[in-house]
Structure formats: C-alpha cells, structure tokens
Amino acid sequence: MLQPKRRKYRKEQKGRNTGKATRGNAVSFGEFGLKAMGRGRLTARQIESARRAMTRHIKRGGRIWIRIFPDKPISKKPAEVRMGNGKGNPEYYVAEIQPGKMLYEMDGVSEDLAREAFRLAAAKLPIATNFVVRQVGT
C-alpha cells in the first residue's frame, strides 16, 4: 500500500478540505482518466483496491497511472481508552480529494475496456467520479 517513507512530523491536524482542484485536474499521462466529482478522503486501502479492480479487468494490456498519493496521517485512539492523555497514534494515511482531481489514468486499451475498468474501480471509492477522455492538443 502507498504511504510516505519519511515525514517531518508524525501527526497532522485535521484541517478542512475546501475549494476545488486547481492542479492535477487534466489527463496528463494516459488517454483516459477517472476524475473526482465529489470531495472526500481516500485511504491507501481504497486506492489500492480500486487499482487492483482495474488491473484485473484490463489483464495484460494497457498501463495505469495513480495520480494521487495518501500523504496525510490519520491518528486514532485505541478502543475503550478515556479521553485526554494526548493524541492517538497514526493508524492509516489518506489523500485529501477535491472536486476535479484526476485519480487514475489509463492508456493502451480501447475506450470500452477503459470505461468498464474505471466503473469497477469507482465502485470501490467513496466519492462520485466521472470518466474523461484526453482532449486533442493537451
């Protein structure tokens, strides 16, 4: 699963996920893309699960790019622990997603195959997504 190799600080504040994606919102590497329409957090497990669903569907053909990386640690206190006594330990990592962010890209397969692979991947994700095709000249 994806997670940072090193971090300057082990824990991070919650913050607010506002606005829409101004960077990473175009198809840059492949021919087809899966774009986020909603806002939310994708865990490393969800990103990997969607990747596996796509990879299994396209079999040996094509190439997949993951355009997001889970770099934000989410901490959690153990079960049945009283409040206070500091912040919990990092449990997993998430990628903060704004509307318009390109999540995955694919190349080397037909549009029908890519569309179906992205449909299977989107079923694994907790946010609304759209299938997009690269515009001519970009």
From Swiss-Prot:
It comes from the Bacteria. GO terms for biological process: translation. Keywords: Ribonucleoprotein, Ribosomal protein, RNA-binding, rRNA-binding, tRNA-binding. Residues 1-24 are annotated as: Disordered. InterPro entries: Ribosomal_uL16 (IPR047873), Ribosomal_uL16_bact-type (IPR000114), Ribosomal_uL16_CS (IPR020798), Ribosomal_uL16_dom (IPR016180), Ribosomal_uL16_sf (IPR036920). Pfam families: Ribosomal_L16. The keyword RNA-binding applies. SUPFAM superfamilies: Ribosomal protein L16p/L10e (SSF54686). The keyword rRNA-binding applies. One of its GO terms (molecular function) is tRNA binding. Residues 1-13 have a biased composition (Basic residues). GO terms for cellular component: cytosolic large ribosomal subunit. Part of the 50S ribosomal subunit. Belongs to the universal ribosomal protein uL16 family. Binds 23S rRNA and is also seen to make contacts with the A and possibly P site tRNAs. This is Large ribosomal subunit protein uL16.
